[in-house]
Curated annotation (Swiss-Prot):
It is found in: Cytoplasm. PANTHER family: MITOCHONDRIAL RIBOSOME RECYCLING FACTOR PSEUDO 1 (PTHR20982:SF3), RIBOSOME RECYCLING FACTOR (PTHR20982). The gene is frr. CDD domains: RRF (cd00520). This is Ribosome-recycling factor. One of its GO terms (cellular component) is cytosol. InterPro entries: Ribosome_recyc_fac, Ribosome_recyc_fac_dom, RRF_sf. The keyword Membrane does not apply. Keywords: Cytoplasm, Protein biosynthesis. One of its GO terms (molecular function) is ribosomal large subunit binding. The keyword Protein biosynthesis applies. Belongs to the RRF family. Responsible for the release of ribosomes from messenger RNA at the termination of protein biosynthesis. May increase the efficiency of translation by recycling ribosomes from one round of translation to another. One of its GO terms (biological process) is cytoplasmic translational termination.
Amino acid sequence: MIMIDEIQEDAAQRMDKSLNALKQAFARLRANRAHTSLLDHITVSYYGNNVPLNQVANVSVEDARTLTVTPWERQMVPVIEKAIMTSELGLNPVTAGTVIRVPLPVLTEERRREMVRLVRQEAEAARVAMRNIRRDSNHTIKELIKEKEISEDDQRRAEEAIQKITDNHITQVDELLAVKEQDLMEV
């Protein structure tokens, strides 16, 4: 039974990681408000190494539609500005001395719908990942049956437990999706 518990625990942990990855993906997709996590995935070249933006500058929210980026070193201003411009976010930073202001444009209805479509794709990818984890766990359990290490009753119970874990995580994905869709469609 210890092996089965380990398999279930592993499946739950891997599904939690998928759920966290989905939350991070959702955080990158902005709604109408500025938030610092919007720029988290942007990397800049710093002395030959690509590092996250938040390791070379202070990112803060100036107002509901503006982020401010304050580099710790003056020579990083143009590098950071270029990194923000070339990101897939479609933002146009404005530099004022050593402070980079990043105004967020108002989302059009068309862009909102496109973002909802992207959010749904991310959620579906998370669901698929969780189903794959379930499949892997069930396969491992079937291997134990072949090696006669567990009984068929144990197999059935373990597969039911893994299915419950999967259902729970997929429900969480659906809840996150509903919240994010509502957030994106808010005017």
